[in-house]
Amino acid sequence: MKSKFLLGSLIIISGILIESTSFSQSSGSNIWPNFRGVNCSGIASPKQNPPVNFSPEQNVIWKIALPEGHSSPCIWGDNIFITGFDGEGKLLKMFCIDRKKGAIRWEKKITVDNFEKVNPVSNPSTATPATDGERVYFYFSSYGLLCYDYKGELKWELPVPMPKSNHGMGTSPVVTGDLVILNCFGHQNDPRLLAINKHDGSIVWKYSLPKKDNYSGDSYSTPVIYKNQVIVYASEGVSGYDLKTGDRLWNFAIGVTDAICTPVLGKETMYTTTYSTRGNLDMRAQFPDFTEIIKKYDVNKDLKVDKTEVKDYQILVNPEMSDDSQKRTLAQVFGMWDSNKDNLIDSLEWNNMNLSFASFYEKQGIKAIRLGGQGDLSLNSILWGNPELVSHVSSPLYYNNHVYMIRDGGIISCFDSESGKLLFREKLGTTGAFFASPVAANGRIYIAARNGIVIVVGAGESLKIIAKNNMGDIISATPAIVDNKLYLRTAKTLYAFGEL
């Protein structure tokens, strides 16, 4: 359902496909204007040649300590914009850093009394800033949207109600034409897509999802631009919205739990991954019959179970990951089964949720979807798909007519972008989670694991590992590539790497 607000001025939008934003990959080698670069593609501008080998001691142009945060570098010219989080001081921080010197040009702080509740491996500073070359736009889920000029002067701010989600918001703003687009579909309390006038912070239009009796999943995805549309991946599916009016033009229903990745665009085609908890054949949950649950956990013999009775029944969300924070007991996710909210699970609720899990398994996978249609695209617009070893948090990469995805546990898959043929599926030689998304330059792909290992592979039809670089610190942020440099954020430091 779309709500219209006053249009302050005529919005002119032009361009096509990946070049559809107000700038393109040919705009120059010195921009990486939002999460994952131009239109979230993950691809550096032509002729970029970042280093292959690097570490905290090798090929370091500069490094600078930063507070905790998962946002990625946003770059325009000699300016890097990035955010941080100070939990003790209850501060959210915004930085402008001199790209050549690694010195802070300005720092802004806002005090927040109550931070959004997030996953233990996350924090309230996850959104990557976006810029148009004149102003920079910061989003914090615990505060809202703020706009600064390059001198650090606040131009406007837009409070956004704190979202309610399972893990904390993961989306980032994008700028196109005169609009800042913000995906708030992850809000369980008011899911909506916002288009904001970048000049004054007024809301131009918003599209609200219809309210449902039952929670259907969060959206952590960042919007991408296709021609005169904005594409957003939400729990209901991937949809295209008219940039001028906010009307929903089409929808591709998916129906998995959460919308996590950011789609990427190819030749009139969109590629997205739809992850389902333990959806791979060898990881699917084999839930016992409810009679076994009753026999083992029903202490008061009422043929139902409550949270206290199942506090030790463990469900592995990601069994291929070694991180204990990714493990859950039934008590922790009790609400997923307790559909009538009476704080009890009975046999009907148990069986219904298990059937729901089974349907999620069937819908997961990487998918290639033909663009250009209207209405419901679910039946005739899928070009190909593959259900196995799907990436969880990291987004796919479309590069040189191939599509790559990185699975937690260190598994890379490569597909022909047109036919969907699996060209290879191999182990990268490092395990654990992959929160950062792959980026590409000069025929190479840079893949950062959360354990601090950055793997450089050659793009092509077979796996060729060129280098493995150990940063010795956690990596959750996606790297940026500008001016033959690799800008990489770890848990404590922002690095600029170049050939020395």
Spans of model-derived segments:
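Positively charged n-region of N-terminal signal peptides that target proteins for export
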Residues: 1-5
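Intrinsically disordered, low-complexity Ser/Thr- and Pro-rich stretches
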Residues: 6-7, 396
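Bacterial N-terminal signal peptides
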Residues: 8-19
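Noncatalytic, solvent-exposed loop/strand surfaces
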Residues: 23-500
